[in-house]
Amino acid sequence: MAAKKTYIVITPFFPTPDSYRGCYVYDAVRAIQRDGRYHVEVFVPKRRGDKREGYDIDGLRVHLFPMTALPSYLFNGLTFGINARSLAKAVVKAGIDPADVAVAHGHTSGFGAAALGLKRLNPEIKVLCQHHDLDPYTIRNGRLAGWLPNLSFRAHAARRAYEQIDLHVCISRAVEWNLSHFPQVNPDIDFENYNYKLRKLRGMRKTRLKATTVLYNGVDTRIFNTEGRKTEGTFRIGCIANFQDLKEHRTLLRALGKLQDRGLDFEAELIGTGPELEGCKQLSHELKLDSRVMFLAELPHERLADFYRRLDLFVLPSVFEGFGCVYTEAWSCGTPFIACQGQGIADYIFPEDANLWLASQHDADDLSDKIENYIKKRPEQRLRYPVDIDTLMRDFLDKLQ
């Protein structure tokens, strides 16, 4: 029997012994392992000068490799070549023969570009770049993101790398659209912080992509399920997200204020941290929601499923969401969700059900109407596609071969 080929995952998003950040990539790695077709190796970046070679988490060895980048994403792409060589060197140092590698799967632009260094050692390696965001060219972030020389450099650097990638993996059709049509503005997405940057690049030619596919972020249903679900007493609404402008917590709070004005009884738990948190607390106070809305900074990962199970409804009106694992995690625990139109999760909603579960962007009135409708009528939420990560990964690996 032939030895298994190696599947290398290169990602900035991965848990450590101290943090579960990036657990969705961890879940995907475990699903590939359970599938059994490949031997999986994980590479995570470290700062240059860091002497660590790796760490172990839940019996999985994670290799570290030095990566170079300028602060605040300045001229992102300038060091793609340096990092590609650094990764290739780390792979060989880890005792992995490039001839045994079948797939190099980078998560986000810089890591897809780094994976190209392995293809230079073995041209038979299939290089994948997975896009987790509605900004697949990574032009939105950084203090000087809107400065045209920086913006243009970053976009062109990403395009050069992307045209060498064998397969672009997108977590939703919305992400795939933004990737394929860049720099065209997506008419379904109303987020000016991103759209104005696209307009600055309107003269740039489209990227000649070799191939794209959609792989939805799956759920580990051994953890996220309805076992032990309990909902009783006051109607409970929940939300988990970083407090950023794109998550639209203020729209959610205004919707809750309208529900209170209509005499509806409910309580809400909003979990997360971020720059918008204090402003949201102040808005909650102004709306006289102090007795109904609770803000929690953190929730240990091991308690996440229990949080979902005690909710009646999960609501996150984000207006720039590539997918949103929290929606399908909640659903797997028996809790339906309300999101916004035009986001990645909209793929999972049947078109005829959109009026139940997808609110207009930035619209507290529409959001409050949809929450009220669920409180009063409790319609069943159906999803168009599987959420189980083993099912999704098996189908993906079938296509990959």
Give the label of every model feature segment.
Residues R48, A155-A211:
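A short, active-site helix/loop in glycosyltransferases that binds the activated sugar's phosphate group
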Residues I8, V169, V214, K230-K247, ...:
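Conserved donor-binding/catalytic core segment of Leloir-type glycosyltransferases
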Residues E298-L299, D306-L311:
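Short alpha-helical donor nucleotide-sugar binding micro-motif in glycosyltransferases
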